[in-house]
Amino acid sequence: MKDLPARRLLLVHAHPDDESINNGATMARYAAEGAHVTLVTCTLGEEGEVIPPALARLTADRDDALGPHRVGELAAAMRELGVDDHRFLGGAGRYRDSGMMGAEQNGRPGSFWSTSVDEAAAHLVEVIREVRPQVLVTYDPDGGYGHPDHIQAHRVAMRAADLAADPAYGSDAPHTVAKVYWNRVERAAAEAGFERLRTTAPGAFPGIASVDDVPGVTDREHITAEIDGSAYAGAKSAAMRAHATQIAVDGPFFALSNDLGQPLLTTECYQLVRGVPGVPEGERESDLFAGLPPATDGTGAAGAPSATGAANPADAEGGAA
């Protein structure tokens, strides 16, 4: 791939729809601003539940056709966000959705959870060295809420960032990602969103979720970047609607298959865990590329320091492997 824009953003997610819920406004904003946005999705989401009754036959325990259907949903969502570069890790269907933690699907041959981290990371290294992103976004060590595929996506993304920077690994030119972020949701913002839901649309869904049900929710001191995506609220909402088997959207609120309403947030928050902050200590970045040269090739310096001050990136992620 040649002649890419100066700014290049890579996002690594577990299933189709995760990108739109977590980063839809961010992706739409950077795509509109001319950055090259690459999404890597690790599975097809075959084990998901299905909201529309007319599509109930797609589930894994019936026709087992949900994965291919969600490929189409993801393509539609990417059109809404203006993102042209989407890949499935290792190719579509290479790794299967592992189901929720403790499910028998966790250990199924070919499931993402049962796959060696280094094996899966090798495919992501290829993408990193091809696209040469300055910024990588993925989950925290818990995957946001403990789903095995989210945890594995975190491990694979962090490992791939290490391997891609290692000149001794593989034959392609190494590349160091300058900044690595984890998805976060500020607790206070989530609480305010739930209060709006309770006061303005209490009957929009059969029930209302709790703040602690929101993946990646954390206190304000862990938030280092805040992306204002309000101008792209429509694009994010449309992308989420495209994932119709998984998400029901009602104005500024949505629900998953559990029918529990929650706020659709267009200010998206992140925690910088590798790289140098682009703002003074105590301030929040408003741009994930803050502090980077405007036309860098993104190679960065080997062993870019962790924003948490950890010499070993594993220390910054709670020792996750």
From Swiss-Prot:
Catalyzes the deacetylation of 1D-myo-inositol 2-acetamido-2-deoxy-alpha-D-glucopyranoside (GlcNAc-Ins) in the mycothiol biosynthesis pathway. Residues 280-321 are annotated as: Disordered. It is an enzyme of class 3 (hydrolase). Belongs to the MshB deacetylase family. It holds the Pfam family PIG-L. It comes from the Bacteria. Binds 1 zinc ion per subunit. It catalyses: 1D-myo-inositol 2-acetamido-2-deoxy-alpha-D-glucopyranoside + H2O = 1D-myo-inositol 2-amino-2-deoxy-alpha-D-glucopyranoside + acetate. Keywords: Hydrolase, Metal-binding, Zinc. NCBIfam families: mycothiol_MshB. The gene is mshB. GO terms for biological process: mycothiol biosynthetic process. This is 1D-myo-inositol 2-acetamido-2-deoxy-alpha-D-glucopyranoside deacetylase. GO terms for molecular function: N-acetylglucosaminylinositol deacetylase activity; zinc ion binding. Residues 290-321 have a biased composition (Low complexity). InterPro entries: GlcNAc_PI_deacetylase-related, LmbE-like_dom_sf, Mycothiol_biosynthesis_MshB. Its cofactor is Zn(2+). Its EC number is 3.5.1.103. SUPFAM superfamilies: LmbE-like. Zn(2+) binds at H15, D18, H150. Disulfide bonds: none annotated.
